[in-house]
Design a protein with these regions (language model features):
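C-terminal catalytic domains of large/alpha subunits in multi-subunit enzymes
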Residues: 1-113
Length: 113
């Protein structure tokens, strides 16, 4: 969910003086628990103990789950492409905000006319 926020809502906005205006959660929308799918199940690999002294003997996960969020962006981009019956390869920049998605849809509509 953190990665989905990174690719859809966490937009960097700079003012005319070059100052970052979206410096933290108070200035942009971050994902909330309500953004989690209602059926979100995780299965861990069975019989793979970790001998390291970590919390609950967990294994490090690092960035891979974060990067799996590209599937959210890909699904949005495919949805935009469907507007033109997949005849156009739409440009959808990240973060894929609602405004950028709408602009991409408009661009696809213009190109398939």
């Amino acid at each position: 969910v953190q990665g989905a926020g990174w690719l859809t809502t966490e937009e960097l906005v700079w003012n005319g003086k070059g100052q970052l205006m979206t410096q933290g959660p108070a200035t942009y929308k971050i994902p909330a628990i309500s953004d989690t799918p209602p059926h979100f199940k995780v299965n861990l690999v069975a019989n793979r103990p970790n001998g390291e002294q970590t919390v609950y003997h967990s294994k490090a996960v690092g960035e891979p789950p974060f990067m799996l969020a590209i599937s959210v962006w890909s699904a949005l981009r495919d949805a935009v492409a469907s507007v033109g019956d997949y005849q156009v390869n739409p440009a959808l920049h990240t973060p894929a905000t609602p405004e950028r998605i709408l602009a991409a849809v408009d661009q696809v509509k213009q190109q398939v006319r």
